[in-house]
């Protein structure tokens, strides 16, 4: 699983260990339960310590649970979660779309490639939406993949987020300024 590869890489270069010095880390597994979520919430609400929660696109925690306010101050996505093209259901759906496109030509607006991309961005947008739940909520959203530089991918992100997108070589400074701004708002 890609998440496990990222974590292993971070451990090999000691980034993961640096995270552990600052925050308690929780990692979603296939069998993740309510217990993991409760421990995460307790760390934030009771211990007032903050925490990192690693989830996967399409997993229970990235789709069905809200992380409003201090439960979700950052969403960091790495890569694009395109579905497996060898999945039978996806193959059949794309073949049907291609058949309809051939039959109706330009009158049939959907293409198999746009359908495939929409499946990917549905997952991304669901994950992003877990952390910003009301008008006064805020979170840093990091979309880490070179393909986000392409207009066709940016256009799949909600318009209200598109307005705030920045590409940055000094991301740490940008994030620090973001949280300084929101800390001052509360005073």
Q: Which residues does each PLM region occupy?
A:
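ASCE RecA-like P-loop NTPase motor cores
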Residues: 1-187
């Amino acid at each position: 699983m890609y998440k496990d590869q990222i974590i292993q890489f971070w451990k090999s270069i000691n980034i993961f260990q640096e995270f552990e010095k600052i925050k308690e880390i929780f990692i979603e597994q296939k069998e993740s339960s309510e217990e993991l979520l409760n421990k995460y919430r307790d760390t934030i609400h009771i211990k007032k310590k903050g925490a990192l929660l690693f989830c996967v696109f399409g997993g229970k925690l990235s789709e069905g649970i809200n992380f409003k306010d201090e439960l979700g101050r950052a969403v960091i996505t790495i890569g694009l979660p395109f579905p497996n093209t060898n999945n039978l259901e996806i193959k059949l759906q794309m073949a049907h779309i291609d058949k309809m496109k051939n039959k109706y030509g330009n009158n049939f607006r959907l293409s198999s490639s746009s359908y495939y991309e929409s499946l990917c961005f549905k997952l991304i947008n669901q994950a992003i939406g877990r952390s910003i739940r009301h008008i006064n909520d805020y979170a840093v959203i990091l979309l880490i993949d070179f393909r986000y530089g392409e207009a066709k991918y940016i256009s799949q992100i909600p318009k209200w987020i598109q307005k705030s997108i920045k590409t940055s070589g000094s991301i740490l400074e940008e994030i620090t300024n973001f949280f300084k701004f929101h800390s001052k708002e509360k005073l």
